[in-house]
Amino acid sequence: AMFGMPTEDDGTRDDLMRRADTACYIAKDGGRNRTHLYLDCDEAVVARKGEMSWAARVQHALANDEFQLLGQRIVAPQGGPGYYYEMLLRMVEPDGSLVPPMAFLPAAERYGLMPAVDRAVIELALREHRELQQATLQPVRLAINLSGSSLSDPSLLDFIRDALIRHDVPAHSICFELTE
């Protein structure tokens, strides 16, 4: 059992419920049979608020196509035909700056957003594959990072198969890498 209690009486009933909810999550993270009092200056509260803010930003980025992939070229020592890229995820800020994944992926993991993020990455990568293929007229292979949480999604394989067909990308040109 866990118990979270806001200690400040200002704000609306919804504000108090959000504070109690935050305190409950912190108590739950601390282990069994814990209580936690909500204080605005509490480091755990500040960290939780930060994660919740990032989760909201990830949801906004998903809804508004505000993710971007950067291709990091991988060159084999012996050379060879074609191009091979690892696709690296970034979130685009309103000012155009790019946010590295370590800033927002922990919150996306905690709040169950990774399957949606992974699907967005797959779509972006396959679209990019087609554009690279047309621009280079060479074989193009891409490495796409997926979260471990997406493996439990029973519809992921069908989604990938449909996306490969939709973007006209041969399956052998895509390598999925699982992050820990």
Where are these regions (language model features)?
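Catalytic core regions of nucleotide second-messenger enzymes
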Residues: 8-11, 28, 97, 133-140, ...
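Active-site core of bacterial EAL-family cyclic-dinucleotide phosphodiesterase domains
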Residues: 49-107, 145, 177
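GGDEF/GGEEF active-site signature
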Residues: 1-7, 162
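Catalytic core of bacterial c-di-GMP phosphodiesterases, primarily the EAL and HD-GYP domains
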Residues: 35, 76, 81-86, 113-180
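Residue-level signal for short segments within beta-strands and strand-turn junctions
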Residues: 2-4, 39, 75-76, 91
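C-di-GMP signaling machinery
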Residues: 6-7, 12-14, 19-22, 26-68, ...
